[in-house]
UniProtKB/Swiss-Prot annotation:
Keyword Coiled coil: no
Record keywords, A-Z: Aminotransferase, Pyridoxal phosphate, Transferase
Descriptive protein name: UDP-4-amino-4,6-dideoxy-N-acetyl-beta-L-altrosamine transaminase
Organism classification: Bacteria, Pseudomonadati, Campylobacterota, Epsilonproteobacteria, Campylobacterales
Residues with the N6-(pyridoxal phosphate)lysine modification: K183
């Protein structure tokens, strides 16, 4: 039986050639390709500065540690509970307290729920572009300006996504992207921070590499605390090659999503999120929201899909439900996040899927739901 992952890398001969060139060059790290990758990201996203990292998690930590001077009197940061846990974990690692906001039915933070969470301790808002759909940028920008907050974006899902015909990446003070193997473009593991703030860029650049400023070939100076979060040349070469194909890879995902939309239209079991999009999305995920009557048998539905070779996933368990967060904060459940978690399933959507496979998956999904016969 053929299996279909919810996402997987799309690699070709050019990608392999780019990697082999680095291996043959013997310059495996701290070479020109990481710089070229950063330059290409700036051009692709329309931003001034980009820094590539060995993961989006280390990119988040670097941003959180450097966007502003830390103050114990202003240590709360509002974010979404529907994200991969790194979004909040790195806030904890940086000394901040995450405050979780409600979400909308598209998986993004509810901008109308933010203001009531703001107080004298609030430092910033960290949004997440769920599944590749941009948050309502203007609303968040206005709120941050009104209350003198920093606007940071975890755009790990959203490379190539747009808001009002402009690419995500330049709206917040800084934005983080992920190049993990299941993202629209990949470096196996990897990430980036982009910003138009030159001072912040320099701080993060030092933090990424031991806080060290090289004066010349044999001598340097340590200016601040730092880590080794660099992306090596092998990964940078792969990223550079993948980025050239980003529009094509996005188009393939869009074609798959549109095929799902057509087959799923007006079905009685679930609502796909893709038809609700107003702006271009990376389509990192293809989420569906099951109708409430299916909530109690979600695990059985997922098991049935997997038996059919459809390796669906769930994105995400609310972060505050994890044991660590319950022990630290004992956060009360947020109904919007709870409902989303109970309803959401991510179906296979990636550039390796041909349309015949997408059609077969879609019809198998409908048959799976039909087999449960819940009134």
């Amino acid at each position: 039986m053929k299996e279909f992952a919810y996402s997987e890398p799309c690699l070709d001969k050019e990608d392999k050639k780019a990697v082999l060139e680095v291996l043959n060059s013997k310059q495996l790290t701290q070479g020109k390709r990481s710089l070229l990758f950063e330059e290409a990201l700036c051009e692709f996203l329309g931003v001034k500065h980009a820094l590539v990292f060995n993961s989006a998690t280390s990119a988040l930590l670097t941003l959180y540690r450097n966007f502003s001077e830390f103050s114990a009197d202003r240590n709360e940061i509002i974010t979404t509970p529907i994200s991969f846990v790194a979004t909040a974990n790195m806030l904890l690692e940086s000394g901040y307290t995450p405050v979780f906001a409600g979400i909308k039915n598209d998986g993004n933070i509810d901008e109308l729920a933010l203001e009531k969470l703001i107080n004298e301790r609030t430092k910033a808002i960290v949004s997440v572009d769920y599944a590749g759909k941009s948050v309502e940028v203007e609303s968040v920008q206005k709120l941050c300006k009104k209350h003198s907050l920093s606007f940071l974006s975890d755009s790990s899902h959203a490379l190539g996504s747009e808001y009002q015909n402009k690419k995500v990446g330049g709206f917040a003070l800084a934005s983080v992207f992920s190049f993990h193997a299941i993202k629209p473009i990949t470096t196996a593991e990897g990430g980036a921070v982009v910003t138009n703030d030159s001072e912040l860029h320099e701080k993060m650049k030092l933090f990424r590499s031991h806080g060290m400023l090289k004066k010349d070939f044999f001598e340097g100076e340590v200016k601040s605390i730092g880590h080794n979060f660099r992306l090596n040349e092998i990964q940078s070469a792969l990223g550079l090659s993948q980025l050239k194909k980003a529009p094509f890879l996005m188009q393939k995902r869009e074609e798959a999503a549109l095929t799902y939309d057509r087959i799923f239209k007006d079905n009685p079991y679930f609502t796909p999120l893709h038809p609700l999009l107003k702006d271009k999305s990376s389509n990192h995920l293809y989420p569906i929201l099951m109708h409430q009557k299916f909530f109690t048998c979600k695990k059985l539905i997922l098991e049935s899909l997997h038996k059919r070779g459809i390796l669906a996933q769930v994105h995400y368990k609310p972060i505050y439900q994890y044991q660590l967060y319950q022990q630290l904060f004992n956060t009360a459940p947020l109904k919007s996040a709870e409902d989303f978690y109970h309803a959401e399933i991510s179906l296979p959507c990636h550039a390796n899927l041909n349309l015949e496979s997408v059609q077969n998956i879609a019809h198998s999904v409908l048959k799976t739901f039909e087999s449960f016969k819940i009134e």
